[in-house]
């Protein structure tokens, strides 16, 4: 059966001498594994459309356990990202996140569109990269059914507290009276909570130039790092570690 769909290449690895094994996040059939035969040959018609980050139109043949790329036409290669190692590393982190959170064969158009908009924004020199990354992380978790609860205590429902903490295990805020339910919870201030809620509520185009205090960035980053680690069951993202060293 032939399927026509657009998609983002999340991963491309060498398979044999001339083939590529791909992980593609498609709009029509979700995340899939696919083989692109002969794609590593320099004159292959498939070469440009199967590079990591490529946003391409695909004609796919669905086999018993694997898709085959019959045709592909790149729509966006994101050359600007490839010319800046830090932006490239952050963009690769987005792809790692998407691959980690999605199930094979399950579509998620909100996440698909979010990835496209974010990669396009990351091409711009004037954007606040850290702000965009935090917004993407929050929205990715929301669109995957893992939105953190940030409006009241997840245990008792209290909407005000002398001292808030964030529990990754419980999935959100815990007030000062409920701190004991999670010994690994992280202290979080009201401004960080407000920032997280703002990033969840606004679209990426509104967020792109938002300047945030470095302390708030670090505070939200600490919370989200633990939250993602717990819910995606993943400790490290290689591309993010590379970006931090640059």
Curated annotation (Swiss-Prot):
- UniProt keyword list: DNA damage, DNA recombination, DNA repair
Q: Where is the signal peptide?
A: none
Report the Pfam families cross-referenced here: RecO_C, RecO_N
Q: Is the keyword Transmembrane in the record?
A: no
Q: Which SUPFAM superfamilies does the record match to this protein?
A: ArfGap/RecO-like zinc finger, Nucleic acid-binding proteins
Gene3D superfamilies, sorted: Nucleic acid-binding proteins (2.40.50.140), Recombination protein O, C-terminal domain (1.20.1440.120)
A cellular component annotation (GO) from this entry? bacterial nucleoid
GO aspect biological process, one term: DNA recombination
**Family as reported in the entry's similarity comment:** Belongs to the RecO family.
* HAMAP family given in the database record: RecO (MF_00201)
Q: Which PANTHER family does the annotation name?
A: DNA REPAIR PROTEIN RECO (PTHR33991:SF1)
Q: What does this protein do?
A: Involved in DNA repair and RecF pathway recombination.
Spell out the protein name for this chain: DNA repair protein RecO
Organism for this UniProt entry? Alkaliphilus metalliredigens (strain QYMF)
